[in-house]
UniProtKB/Swiss-Prot annotation:
The gene is CHI2. Substrate binds at T48, N113, S190. It catalyses: a chalcone = a flavanone. Its EC number is 5.5.1.6. InterPro entries: CFI, Chalcone_isomerase, Chalcone_isomerase_3-sand, Chalcone_isomerase_bundle_sf, Chalcone_isomerase_sf. One of its GO terms (molecular function) is chalcone isomerase activity. Pathway: Secondary metabolite biosynthesis; flavonoid biosynthesis. The record marks Y106 as: Important for catalytic activity. SUPFAM superfamilies: Chalcone isomerase. This is Chalcone--flavanone isomerase 2.
Length: 237
């Protein structure tokens, strides 16, 4: 599949069609990408560019329920994105700075959002509190100039590997691993979920997967078939 999925350029950030995430033996394809920004005094200010990558088997896994849905239907579906976030396949998220940011600013904002949601649903336990402490510790002394990236490898077993790149490369190993499924899922959901920080990335993922899923009737037979149908979808797009 990796060869037939196109890359995405967002400003000065290029998201290639496929990457091998830190700590992973798999090559993941680019599910979608978009910016995180905010309206400030009438201007849309872009803070980060975000790319979301998925393991090949995400397509047959999602096709069972979502094939034939339009990009608009998928964009509006809370359940669809929950299946991406919680699905039994690897995910990789690259957050690249457009404006400079400190590690403390980033980790505290992510942590606040996660804890608020967990407390709302009554799922915040000591395990999550310890995971948040470790998450904040990873970023404590970091600074991220424009072009630097924070990298999240999300394993189906619930582990979250955090990597840091200051030169645009993707390292083979990460800086830390946090064994907490809820945190791992929440990091991705905070980006492409219904209330996520990048509606543009959410729409991009929905649009690209809608095209792949259209051709997924014969994708469930294995990776070779997935690759074939992906090429067909790309040719039609």
């Amino acid at each position: 599949m990796a060869q037939s999925v196109t890359g995405i350029q967002i400003g000065g950030t290029s998201f290639p069609p496929a990457v091998k995430p830190p700590g992973s033996g798999n090559t993941l394809f680019l599910g979608g990408a978009g910016v995180r920004g905010m309206e400030i005094q009438g201007n849309f200010v872009k803070f980060t560019a975000i790319g979301v990558y998925l393991e090949d088997k995400a397509v047959p896994a999602l096709s069972v329920k979502w094939k034939g849905k339009t990009a608009e239907e998928l964009t509006e579906s809370v359940e669809f994105f929950r299946e991406i976030v919680t699905g039994p396949f690897e995910k990789f998220t690259q957050v690249t700075m457009i404006l400079p940011l400190t590690g403390q600013q980033y980790s505290e904002k992510v942590s606040e959002n996660c804890v608020a949601i967990w407390k709302k649903f009554g799922i915040y336990t000591d395990a999550e509190a310890k995971a948040i402490e470790k998450f904040i510790e990873v970023f404590k002394d970091q600074t991220f100039p424009p072009g630097a990236s924070i990298l999240f490898t999300q394993s189906p077993n619930g582990s979250l590997m955090i990597g840091i790149s200051k030169d645009g490369s993707i390292p083979e190993v990460g800086n830390a691993v946090i064994e907490n499924k809820l945190l791992s899922e929440s990091v991705l959901e905070s980006i492409i979920g219904k209330q996520g920080v990048s509606p543009e990335a959410r729409k991009s993922v929905a649009t690209r997967l809608s095209e792949l899923l259209k051709e997924s009737d014969h994708c469930v037979a294995g990776n070779e078939k997935v690759d074939e149908c992906t090429k067909e979808a790309e040719n039609k797009a």
